[in-house]
């Protein structure tokens, strides 16, 4: 099991410096509410976790996150420091520094420095770095850019030529060097016993990414439209079909065509939601009406479905359900997971948007008392604030730091 211990953000969007500790004394905090006025940096926390998740999975920085980084010649480096803990064993940190061009939609971004380290949870133990990478190439405006870098670790992993080639590749792709699949191939192929700790730490960070659930502003804004994104964690023991993530519930007139092989996922999701929704919203159940089967030109079969809201026998299209209820339905998969599983970390932006404040307050109170995982959310609603003890609340501010 891995827990989120802290996050430090510097020069991302309008955040000059921000730190959040997800631990109170020796206990991990199961619910953290982030509050602050508009423009104080609440959503930057969600953005940063999206960037971290992409980098640590070996992927590129998401295109929709380009533009959140400050140009390096204006305010300094964009820094993120993530700290995790494997209870009873060790703390792990990952530090990344990013350089960026002017903050436009086509913003160029380079990972210029990364570091992975750990500290055993033993008396007197110190942090030990495992691997460091530093970019030593050209600036963004170079006519003939040169991409070079250095890699330092406790044992040699790659030669200089291989490092240079990989540096160019990850720079072009806006990826992490330390979490690149190419570097992992070198590490696993080396078969050096001295790298066993590094491989173990990589495994922990991979587990963190697998357990991370993010419900961002883009998903939240969709709940008021014709497509409601639904968070799910579907497992079918008979067919061995598994699906974790987000599926779309299209509410367009005339129904929604879904591939026949995905029909059990939707059907199972409706059944699963109906085990929980009535406990939160009395007399409400969801239905999925199945229409005719369509065969497309390529031979693939689709089923036409319609999603129905049933309120104590009164049936109408889910499209005309309130935005707040659709928002709860949309988030429910992640909320149930973080409530029941101690290894899940769910991050939800604007949790309160469109949701009736009394219902929201009751939900947060239940989670604060009994959730096993870690729920982190941003909110404007003071009703939620009343339901949380002070150590579970983080305030963002627009005041500048004066050094």
Feature roles, as predicted:
Residues 10, 21-23, 83-87, 99, ...:
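A structural detector for beta-sheet-dominated domains
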């Amino acid at each position: 099991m891995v827990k989120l211990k802290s996050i430090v953000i510097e020069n991302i969007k309008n955040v000059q410096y921000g730190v959040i500790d997800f631990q109170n004394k020796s206990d991990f905090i199961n619910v953290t509410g982030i509050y602050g006025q508009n423009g104080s940096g609440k959503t930057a926390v969600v953005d940063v976790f999206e960037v971290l998740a992409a980098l640590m999975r070996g992927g590129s920085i998401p295109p929709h996150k380009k533009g959140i980084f400050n140009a390096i010649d204006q305010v300094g480096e964009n820094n993120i420091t993530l700290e995790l803990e494997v209870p009873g064993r060790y703390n792990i940190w990952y530090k990344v520094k990013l350089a960026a061009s002017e903050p436009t939609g086509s913003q160029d971004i380079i990972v210029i420095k990364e570091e992975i380290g750990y500290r055993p949870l033993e008396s007197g133990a110190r942090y030990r770095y495992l691997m460091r990478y530093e970019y030593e190439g050209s600036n963004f405006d170079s006519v003939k850019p040169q991409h070079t870098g250095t890699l330092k670790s406790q044992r040699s992993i790659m030669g200089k030529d291989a490092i240079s080639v990989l540096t160019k590749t990850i720079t072009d792709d806006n990826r992490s060097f330390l979490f690149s699949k190419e570097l992992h191939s070198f590490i696993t192929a080396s078969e050096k016993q001295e790298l066993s700790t590094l491989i173990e730490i990589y495994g922990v960070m991979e587990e963190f990414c697998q357990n991370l659930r993010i419900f961002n502003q883009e998903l939240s804004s969709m709940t008021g439209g014709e497509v409601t994104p639904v968070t799910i964690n579907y497992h079918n023991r008979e067919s061995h079909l598994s699906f974790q993530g987000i599926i779309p519930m299209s509410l367009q007139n005339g129904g929604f065509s879904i591939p026949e092989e995905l029909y059990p996922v939707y059907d199972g999701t409706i059944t699963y939601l109906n085990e929980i929704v009535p406990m939160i919203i009395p007399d409400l159940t969801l239905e999925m009406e199945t229409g005719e089967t369509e065969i497309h030109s390529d031979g693939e079969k689709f089923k036409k479905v319609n999603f129905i809201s049933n309120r104590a026998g009164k049936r109408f299209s889910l499209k005309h359900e309130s935005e707040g209820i659709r928002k709860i339905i949309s988030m429910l998969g992640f909320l149930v997971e973080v409530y029941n599983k101690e290894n899940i970390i769910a991050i939800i932006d604007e949790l309160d948007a469109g949701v009736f404040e009394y219902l929201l307050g009751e939900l947060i109170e239940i989670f604060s008392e009994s959730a096993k995982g870690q729920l982190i959310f941003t909110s404007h609603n003071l009703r939620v604030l009343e339901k949380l003890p002070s150590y579970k609340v983080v305030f963002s501010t627009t005041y500048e730091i004066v050094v």
